[in-house]
Amino acid sequence: MQNFKELGISDNTVQSLESMGFKEPTPIQKDSIPYALQGIDILGQAQTGTGKTGAFGIPLIEKVVWKQGVQSLILAPTRELAMQVAEQLREFSRGQGVQVVTVFGGMPIERQIKALKKGPQIVVGTPGRVIDHLNRRTLKTDGIHTLILDEADEMMNMGFIDDMRFIMDKIPAVQRQTMLFSATMPKAIQALVQQFMKSPKIIKTMNNEMSDPQIEEFYTIVKELEKFDTFTNFLDVHQPELAIVFGRTKRRVDELTSALISKGYKAEGLHGDITQAKRLEVLKKFKNDQINILVATDVAARGLDISGVSHVYNFDIPQDTESYTHRIGRTGRAGKEGIAVTFVNPIEMDYIRQIEDANGRKMSALRPPHRKEVLQAREDDIKEKVENWMSKESESRLKRISTELLNEYNDVDLVAALLQELVEANDEVEVQLTFEKPLSRKGRNGKPSGSRNRNSKRGNPKFDSKSKRSKGYSSKKKSTKKFDRKEKSSGGSRPMKGRTFADHQK
């Protein structure tokens, strides 16, 4: 494989790349960089995690002219992605004096205006805030020679298609090189390409080892009122390193996050009403392993570039194929394996079939874990935790209590009782989730049927979405089993029947 030097990259940039651990270009970088250096328009179809930031960012650094003034503009769908792209560009150009500025909403515009006045060579921003600066004339386009649209389909999904068109129209076509990257190519993006790009070089890296996500896709059939308990059982059995859980609404995300926390899981939520400061705090916790479960809506998760996500759970099934593709694309990145589990109500199976038909592959049916499997997983987890606890020095007062208990009770029975409380602790916590109606069945035309009842009050005769709430598993009562003081334990309980659950961890 070619190295960066052979692609025409300067020694300074190669040195920066090597210091970052990049010895060889990824497939999309190898295919894109030569054309990008020549000023040719590029249409790249690639997912996050394939090295596409380097595909446009490295040649961008190489083309910087050493004078003040914006020369390159990069559009990104979210603040988080804009910041990530900007940080990578700074790393690529370390020691070369390239100034990179980010502009996005949720932050004081005055500070951004001040930064733009210093004449940065590269600006990375979200469409809305870029337009604000264009209208204020604090961002000038006369010196811009390169325009990048990163995750264009995400920007389209977020309603930025007209904003993208407005911005592209502001930069003279004669001087503009355009590079557009997108995981999918919907018709609106194709129209944008035809209108604003000049015979672009088409580069696809969707089917190579690096960019083809190695994701095991499953669906599990479960009723709404049983969904939360089934979900937490999967969490206990799978033991995900990092997991993203998708809910359909902000309310769902809030309630699901609270329910998980009450059950002892390390979780945080993200949706459109979360402040920018809180978003950054949550993402920092997720990346630093302070939490391992991120609950999010589709909009809130767009543009997130988080490595190491082992599992994606679609707590609520997405309404379209593109949303499904973007959701599960959060795992299985950069050649790593991932697991995606979609929870589906029996009447929503048409949506599973639609996704399968569109993607050309089948999902595997996955039965919910049996109680025996869940308890076994919890026991294994408790064993590991106990080993960690034993390595720590206990407080003297706890040692005193331990001695008193051991003098009073049989040691095996005592430990067994404590472990039982730990293993079954989650079962005693009662949670409440607002009942969400399943998606409507699809008609023959592929659209939801029964639309005439959309505004009717009929709904579900048994559960009204406004007044009824589903409770988490709470039928398991606290054990009333007593143990005799200083008497021998009398064997274990009878094992439950059932097949062994296939633990799909990597």
From Swiss-Prot:
One of its GO terms (molecular function) is ATP hydrolysis activity. Residues 33-203 form the Helicase ATP-binding domain. GO terms for cellular component: cytosol; ribosome. It catalyses: ATP + H2O = ADP + phosphate + H(+). DEAD-box RNA helicase possibly involved in RNA degradation. Unwinds dsRNA in both 5'- and 3'-directions, has RNA-dependent ATPase activity. Oligomerizes, may be a member of the RNA degradosome. This is DEAD-box ATP-dependent RNA helicase CshA. It comes from Staphylococcus aureus (strain bovine RF122 / ET3-1). The lineage of its organism: Bacteria, Bacillati, Bacillota, Bacilli, Bacillales.
